[in-house]
Design a protein with these regions (language model features):
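Boundary regions of SH3-family modules and the immediately adjacent low-complexity/disordered segments
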Residues: 76, 154-194, 198-208, 217-219, ...
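Membrane-embedded alpha-helical segments of integral membrane proteins
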Residues: 109-152
Length: 248
């Protein structure tokens, strides 16, 4: 048993040491990226910021600076991709949203989006109230309040019922938000121009054309093809290698 305990302690020590080493390496890479960015050496800056992400360090500043470096380097699709990746973690960040909009203005395609569905409108409304973490914390707080009121503080029993209701509503809201987010994955077109086909085969009729930086929604895959939808409801098939997924 003693040897097992020592092994566990050693494993935990090595894990913590590795995490600290990764954090320090990420900080060094981030500072190197900032220096290269200020010197307008965008290739070096991009490589450094990618190293930060490879170390598992995800911050708004890393995604923002990486997107900016790609944009300054003339790589619009990559800049859009990393602003979008940043918004997966920091959904309401004004800087990421502003720079994304600026980069999107450089795209060739001008697509008029369809109105949001009822489910999408509800999803956005709930996220405007609180993000996923906020709903999770709310559910936990009111669940604890219910437990305290029910078992520890008899005088608070009158708030036990309302606390349980709020906890359940917050929890169900969290599940709804997570389900929507898990079911949706978008991608960015990375080719200067790509033909969207009516069927998943090379000689299929061309449905329409898209250009670098356009955001698409993959809905189905078949061999080397991906069926995609765009914001105006049009759909078709493209070669999977011509897009990069926002969630990887």
């Amino acid at each position: 048993m003693r040897s097992v305990t020592l092994l566990i302690v050693l494993f935990l020590s090595l894990t913590i040491t590795a995490q600290e080493a990764g954090f320090e390496k990420g900080i060094v890479a981030f500072e190197a990226g900032n220096k290269a960015y200020l010197e307008e050496d965008y290739d070096v800056a991009i490589k450094a910021y990618q190293e930060v992400l490879a170390e598992g360090l995800h911050s708004k500043e890393v995604y923002l600076n990486l997107g900016n470096a790609y944009y300054k380097n003339g790589q619009t699709a990559s800049s859009i991709l990393y602003y979008e990746k940043g918004l997966l973690h920091f959904k309401k960040d004004v800087d990421l949203l502003t720079n994304l909009q600026f980069a999107e203005n450089q795209r060739i395609d001008r697509i008029e989006p369809l109105p949001d569905s009822i489910i999408k409108r509800v999803y956005k409304f709930l996220l405007n109230l609180m993000d996923s973490e906020g709903w999770a914390v709310t559910s936990l707080i009111f669940a604890l309040l219910f437990a305290v009121a029910k078992t520890i503080k008899p005088r608070l029993r009158k708030i036990a019922g309302p606390s349980l209701i709020v906890a359940l509503i917050a929890f169900l809201t969290l599940l709804f938000i997570q389900k929507i987010e898990r079911s949706e994955n978008y991608a960015i077109v990375f080719e200067p121009a790509v033909t969207v086909l009516s069927d998943p085969k090379i000689d299929a009729p061309v449905a329409f054309e898209l250009h670098e930086g356009t955001k698409v929604k993959p809905v189905e895959s078949f061999e080397e093809f991906q069926k995609i939808e765009i914001a105006n409801g049009q759909s078709g098939w493209i070669v999977t290698s011509s897009i990069r997924f926002i969630k990887e």
